[in-house]
């Protein structure tokens, strides 16, 4: 199984992540932010990856340090799990509807980090999670994973539905991108020869 473990300890957070790309879609652990745990459950299920998180953060301040550092850690674990990226499909995309909401996520595991985030969430928080932290999570993740990531809200009105559709679509797009392409086995999908 392709996987990695990553640990990050700072004055603000203590985080450990175990990631297995060829998993059963299981999330285990707690971030201290209930809604974010729900999102990681969806990400794991739709990405068919196994994700275990241990996290202690300074949530008495707010969720910023915890959420951003989780993005950093997951991005680093993903980069480690992919290694030289030989044989992967590299690209992935998904549209996910949820009632009135429609989200599109497209990504490229190119080694060139860039985030395009075209999402307006009409509420300031869902549960304990400040909604502006969704963008910060994906920015940190894309930077550390070396991922070009586009997230677009095409239709939507309910904050919970929007964030849920984003995490589901990201999981499904990631599942496509990390899949092994039998026609490209042992090769990197780039004319440069590296990603």
From Swiss-Prot:
It is found in: Cytoplasm. It catalyses: D-erythro-1-(imidazol-4-yl)glycerol 3-phosphate = 3-(imidazol-4-yl)-2-oxopropyl phosphate + H2O. Pathway: Amino-acid biosynthesis; L-histidine biosynthesis; L-histidine from 5-phospho-alpha-D-ribose 1-diphosphate: step 6/9. SUPFAM superfamilies: Ribosomal protein S5 domain 2-like. It is an enzyme of class 4 (lyase). GO terms for biological process: L-histidine biosynthetic process. Keywords: Amino-acid biosynthesis, Cytoplasm, Histidine biosynthesis, Lyase. Its main location: cytoplasm. Pfam families: IGPD. GO terms for cellular component: cytoplasm. PROSITE patterns: IGP_DEHYDRATASE_1 (PS00954), IGP_DEHYDRATASE_2 (PS00955). GO terms for molecular function: imidazoleglycerol-phosphate dehydratase activity. Its EC number is 4.2.1.19. Belongs to the imidazoleglycerol-phosphate dehydratase family. This is Imidazoleglycerol-phosphate dehydratase.
